[in-house]
Swiss-Prot record:
Protein name: Glutathione transport system permease protein GsiD
Keyword Cell membrane attributed: yes
GO molecular function terms listed in the Swiss-Prot or TrEMBL record: dipeptide transmembrane transporter activity
Lineage per the UniProt record: Bacteria, Pseudomonadati, Pseudomonadota, Gammaproteobacteria, Enterobacterales
Gene: gsiD
Membrane topology: Multi-pass membrane protein
Organism: Escherichia coli O1:K1 / APEC
Highest taxon in the source lineage: Bacteria
Keywords: Cell inner membrane, Cell membrane, Membrane, Transmembrane, Transmembrane helix, Transport
Bilayer-crossing regions: 40-60, 105-125, 144-164, 165-185, 222-242, 266-286
Keyword Nucleotide-binding in annotation: no
Complex and partners: The complex is composed of two ATP-binding proteins (GsiA), two transmembrane proteins (GsiC and GsiD) and a solute-binding protein (GsiB).
Major localisation: membrane
Family note: Belongs to the binding-protein-dependent transport system permease family.
Amino acid sequence: MRLFNWRRQAVLNAMPLVKPDQVRTPWHEFWRRFRRQHMAMTAALFVILLIVVAIFARWIAPYDAENYFDYDNLNNGPSLQHWFGVDSLGRDIFSRVLVGAQISLAAGVFAVFIGAAIGTLLGLLAGYYEGWWDRLSMRICDVLFAFPGILLAIAVVAVLGSGIANVIIAVAIFSIPAFARLVRGNTLVLKQQTFIESARSIGASDMTILLRHILPGTVSSIVVFFTMRIGTSIISAASLSFLGLGAQPPTPEWGAMLNEARADMVIAPHVAVFPALAIFLTVLAFNLLGDGLRDALDPKIKG
């Protein structure tokens, strides 16, 4: 008996003591993996800065983006007075790009949010119940996928009319099937797991299973796709505005600014360069951030 107690004590003494602050939660593991990705961290800082600028754009902008006109410096390039130069109407491009961040970012985020909400609901129901609802939902998605996204958005705006609100609706519509298929695939896998069978065996309702067990299992995929989809939505909204179907002059939206700059690109290329650069950097940042989130949330994909 003494020998047994001695051996047990020896084993206990050999076991490393785990301090409370050494216990790693899923959040700690995610942050540890994410902060190692320098490109993703840089993109995250850029996105945070962009959000702050978008929120306070009208206070940060040195001039009124719509009603300020410097007729003495028409089409002048960048200077100390006008950091990004002046357009053909004498408006300060730097101020318009800052305020344009507010409009373009809001359009992209709201469009993806609407598409994600509807698509997630459709995907959960289709993957969980299958049957006729699954077939109907996926056939609708197939029809929407048959059209290029921008053409579908143009068709929707042509029916609803021009304007930034209708652009958000149009971009949201062609985001729905992408989220629906993503969530449906995850749901089909998760519903076969033993913990779902256990939940059913104790009498959990379908709503409880969907919201408390299946939906949390799809959140990481939704977050990653949501982040990357924002870049696509910003490009789509800017493209519609460039074609004259979105934000209308003098609204300082990036796509609308490019549309107005077409006539002066030869004599004043800076008028188009800075709005285009804003679109490029924003889309790149969201894509890099999405890649980083994917690798941090599911390191097996990276491997």
